[in-house]
C-alpha cells in the first residue's frame, strides 16, 4: 500500500515538474498559423517540427500540445498580428 502511494505521488510530481506548453502556432508575422485550406494532417506535422507531441486544426488555426518552452505561441495579451 505504501508502495502504491509512493508511486502515485511520483507520477503526480513528474506531471508538475515536466510542464509542456500548448497553444496556437504563430507565423512569421505573429499571426496564428492558418490551416483553413491546408491538407489533413498539416497541423500535426507543423507541431511535430516544433517538437510538439500532437496538434490539430482548431479551425482556422493550428493548435499544438506538448510544445517545448522555447516555442512561441500566440497569446491575446501579446498579439502583434497585423500591427506594425
Curated annotation (Swiss-Prot):
InterPro entries: LCN-type_CS_alpha_beta_dom (IPR044062), Scorpion_toxin-like (IPR003614), Scorpion_toxin-like_sf (IPR036574), Scorpion_toxinL (IPR018218), Scorpion_toxinL/defensin (IPR002061). Gene3D superfamilies: Knottin, scorpion toxin-like. Disulfide bonds join 31-81, 35-57, 43-62, 47-64. Residues 21-82 form the LCN-type CS-alpha/beta domain. One of its GO terms (cellular component) is extracellular region. Beta toxins modify sodium channel function in two ways: an excitatory effect (shifting the activation process to more negative potential) and/or a depressant effect (reducing the peak current). At concentration of 500 nM this toxin produces channel opening at more negative potentials in hNav1.2/SCN2A and hNav1.3/SCN3A, which shows the biggest effect. On the other hand the peak current is decreased in hNav1.4/SCN4A and hNav1.5/SCN5A channels, without apparent modification of the activation gate. This toxin is active against mammals. This is Beta-mammal Tt1g. It comes from Tityus trivittatus. The lineage of its organism: Eukaryota, Metazoa, Ecdysozoa, Arthropoda, Chelicerata.
Amino acid at each position: 500500500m505504501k508502495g502504491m502511494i509512493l508511486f502515485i505521488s511520483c507520477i503526480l510530481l513528474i506531471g508538475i515538474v515536466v510542464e509542456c506548453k500548448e497553444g496556437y502556432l504563430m507565423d512569421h508575422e505573429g499571426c496564428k498559423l492558418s490551416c483553413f485550406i491546408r491538407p489533413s494532417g498539416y497541423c500535426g506535422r507543423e507541431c511535430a517540427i516544433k517538437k510538439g507531441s500532437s496538434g490539430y486544426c482548431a479551425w482556422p488555426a493550428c493548435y499544438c500540445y506538448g510544445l517545448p518552452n522555447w516555442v512561441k505561441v500566440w497569446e491575446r495579451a501579446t498579439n502583434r498580428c497585423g500591427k506594425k
